[in-house]
């Protein structure tokens, strides 16, 4: 495919129709269109309102614990013997991941719109926990749709959601993973448009979700940019993040998109390899199609049916990706690469033993890419890896895979 001519800025999208080039848009049921337009109007008003910004900033600081630290991973750096590796510590946020950034922004939007019920989808459970958390904080009922497979492999997070007062509904359709949970959440939303706010957790879905999720998550990259300038006196050579739907990645990437000297790498779930269908590397092995209200790269068969996919990481187990990532791939600004389950598991253990930090399996995919790249770089070069979440939720999964009885 011919790459489009590089734009003057990579940060101007989406357009008024929610398109990033040929990706994005609003492919939704007629009953949802008025709600989507209402949400867009509410968001446009909110983001220009100093009071909204002040309230979000206060919650981010005093409730979520921002700014998150930019930490020099000295043990891992020395072990690999190449570039200096920094971790953006989103795992230290309240609820244990980057998900709280977006949830705080959206719960304030829901309040402005007068919505009285929150629904959400979740894969690894981190977005479900963050949604249940903000719903509890603002006294709203919350229903979380979660694939039955993910309910089984993320039991600690299921309990946390219930403890926070959310109703967790297992979805057994399909493979019982994130795609199926999102399908059910959309069905709920269509049925309950008057009082319900759908708090989407990733940078996908119909416009304006990819834009607003990106904007709420861009605090990651804005902080990291300022922090690396303070600590190293210059911008990084490389930034790396795991990509499922893509919210933590776009949050880190977006503020760096127009810095031509910064190489940007998104890491997809290579699962058990790209030869078969047991992976979730939609940009490495998929093609454009429409799912969950937007046009993007998808895993699909010759008839256009969506494939189920596989990843050891519940949060990367999604057969699509946010539309802005699809555009960034085709424009050539960001490189997207797959990491296998086994490589992520190795990186999970290596990070734990060299840094005393247990990363989420999603983040371990990004660390695995750092393990590959850092030794090929000079010791004077700098890399930032987004540590998007902590690994408490994954210890049972990892223990089982390593043959340990937990």
Swiss-Prot record:
Enzyme Commission code: 4.2.1.20
N6-(pyridoxal phosphate)lysine sites (modified residues): 99
Superkingdom to which the source organism belongs: Bacteria
Residue spans crossing the bilayer: none
Metabolic or biological pathway: Amino-acid biosynthesis; L-tryptophan biosynthesis; L-tryptophan from chorismate: step 5/5
CDD domains: Trp-synth_B
Pfam family, one: PALP
Keywords, ordered alphabetically: Amino-acid biosynthesis, Aromatic amino acid biosynthesis, Lyase, Pyridoxal phosphate, Tryptophan biosynthesis
Enzymatic reactions: (1S,2R)-1-C-(indol-3-yl)glycerol 3-phosphate + L-serine = D-glyceraldehyde 3-phosphate + L-tryptophan + H2O
SUPFAM superfamilies the record matches: Tryptophan synthase beta subunit-like PLP-dependent enzymes
InterPro entries: Trp_synth_b_CS, Trp_synth_beta, Trp_synth_beta/beta-like, TrpB-like_PALP, TrpB-like_PALP_sf
MF annotations from Gene Ontology: tryptophan synthase activity
Family the UniProt entry places it in: Belongs to the TrpB family.
Its job: The beta subunit is responsible for the synthesis of L-tryptophan from indole and L-serine.
Oligomer and partners: Tetramer of two alpha and two beta chains.
Protein name as annotated: Tryptophan synthase beta chain
